[in-house]
Design a protein with these regions (language model features):
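C-terminal helicase lobe
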Residues: 1-81, 88, 124-125
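Short amphipathic alpha-helical segments embedded in low-complexity Lys/Glu-rich regions
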Residues: 65-70, 108, 283-305, 417-419, ...
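Solvent-exposed serine/threonine-rich low-complexity stretches and specific carbohydrate-binding patches
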Residues: 383-393
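Short, hydrophobic beta-strand segments
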Residues: 389, 396-407
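Exposed beta-strand face motif in extracellular beta-rich ectodomains
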Residues: 408-412
Length: 462
């Protein structure tokens, strides 16, 4: 059946497996970020040595033309690897991901590199975030920036899907000037907002939406870390977006919609009974405390099973926390010097009751545990002075270090921000009278000495 001259040719394909090539060269930035952040790579030579242990290195000589290796000699291979590694490290340095000291050949990971490695975010996405996020970025901007992440380029685009996306886009509140229906980033932009609006979607788009949601929280957490590292208080907006993503609600929606079976009608009934949030609903559902309990239950129109579901949410899931704090030496706070605040958070539980940290999120595709951010900020200057991410069990005691840059009286806010529930945040304020720092005193003394010297020079001239 097969000519003898081609027999060996076909036997090769039957007897030998097809080669699987490496694509590490396309993702080397991400690999280096992970290894540099964990201190596995600390120099250029470490990076070159690391690359020799990869499958990419094994395939280089086996299929050099695929990787653009022109000279397969030892010197040619060494030169190829050195150039590839040095170019990659230079890109990371220019993106302010690492600090590269060429004199002693050391590589130091910078904060963006640590963020990218911790949240498993690509180098290109981190570049986008670092260039786009600033003190003026608001909710719309964060949604646009997050959905521009390269992680969403894997979203499938189907034929005639643009018509459905167009109809969804007409119903969502946040618009952009460049509405490209053939872009995976625009699709992510539309489907994320559809999630906030709790829209019913076709099964294919629902699967795409799940893919988007599974990656959104890490991207938002990275936005929080980037903005907070720059001292921008609008990091709170990214935290609120995290809550919106988990609960499938807009920031303008009632927090009561987190309660099972609470639709617009039930929310309207609750509002008419002067119930605006989940905590007020908890109080109102106590028949011993609320004389109008019977009318409220009747007007809500929920069945006994639905009321039981609502009670389970308020009793077992929605957090009830007591936040208290104590300033350390408030009278000795000086500008530019570290100051401290002791924080205590107590969860309202019975003695024999264990804290439930599992989040009630029926619209979120994966299970999630409850986490919180503690933030010290100043609203008047939009400054974030301290931040810590914590998990709160039965109780938590911790200390935050903050630095106020300017002397004078400052009204600061201690924010306790949930990453998953809307309406559970707390934001008590406190005042600090900040004295002049040592640097300021030294500057004043230097100015006085300069003035005295000038005066002496004038006297000598006379």
């Amino acid at each position: 059946m097969v000519p003898a001259i081609k027999r060996n040719y076909y036997k090769k394909f039957l007897n030998e497996a097809l080669p699987v090539e490496s694509h590490l060269q396309s993702y080397l930035h991400d690999a280096f970020v992970a290894e540099i952040s964990t201190k596995m790579i600390g120099s250029t030579q470490d990076a070159i040595d690391w690359s020799t242990y990869t499958y990419f290195y094994r395939r280089l000589l086996a299929n050099p033309s695929f990787y653009g290796l022109l000279d397969t000699s030892h010197e040619g291979l060494s030169s190829y690897l050195s150039e590839l590694v040095e170019t990659t490290l230079k890109d990371l340095e220019e993106a302010k991901m690492i600090e590269l000291d060429e004199e002693d050949d050391t590589i130091t990971p910078l904060n963006p590199s640590m963020i990218a490695a911790y949240y498993n975010i690509s180098f290109v996405t981190m570049q986008t975030f670092l260039l786009s996020l600033n003190a003026n970025t608001r909710m719309k901007g964060i949604i646009t920036i997050v959905t521009s992440a390269t992680e969403f380029e894997e979203i499938q685009l189907r034929r005639h899907e643009d018509q459905i996306l167009r109809r969804i886009y007409d119903r969502i509140p946040v618009k952009i000037s460049d509405s490209r229906y053939d872009s995976p980033h625009f699709k992510a932009f539309v489907l994320l907002q559809a999630h906030f609006s709790r829209m019913q979607l076709p099964i294919d788009l629902t699967k795409d939406q799940e893919f988007i949601l599974q990656r959104t929280l890490n991207l938002l957490s990275a936005c929080v870390d980037i903005l907070s590292s720059e001292g921008h208080l609008n990091a709170l907006k990214a935290m609120e977006l995290s809550q919106m993503t988990v609960q499938a609600l807009w920031d303008r929606d009632s927090a009561l919609k987190q309660i099972p079976h609470f639709d617009d009608r039930a929310v309207k009934v609750a509002n008419s009974a002067k119930i605006q949030d989940v905590y007020e609903f908890m109080d109102a559902m106590d028949p011993d405390e609320n004389p109008d309990y019977g009318n409220l239950v009747k007007n809500l129109g929920l069945s006994n099973k639905q009321l039981a579901d609502a009670a389970q949410f308020t009793n077992n899931f929605y957090p009830r926390l007591d936040l208290s704090f104590d300033l350390v030496d408030p009278g000795s706070v000086t500008a530019g010097a570290p100051a401290y605040v002791n924080i205590t958070v107590e969860r309202e539980l019975d003695e024999d009751e264990e804290p439930n940290l599992k989040v009630h999120a029926p619209f979120f595709p994966v299970e999630k545990s409850e986490n919180w951010w503690l933030v010290v900020g100043e609203e008047s200057s939009d400054s974030l002075l301290a931040i810590k991410r914590v998990t709160i069990g039965r109780s938590l005691k911790t200390k935050l270090e903050y630095v106020v840059p300017d002397a004078g009286k400052h009204t600061l806010t201690l924010y306790l921000m949930s990453d998953c529930y809307i309406g559970a945040d707390q934001a008590p304020t406190f005042e600090v009278d900040v004295g002049e720092g040592m640097d300021d005193d030294d500057d004043d003394e230097d100015e006085e000495e300069d003035e005295e010297e000038e005066g002496n020079d004038d006297d000598d001239g006379e």
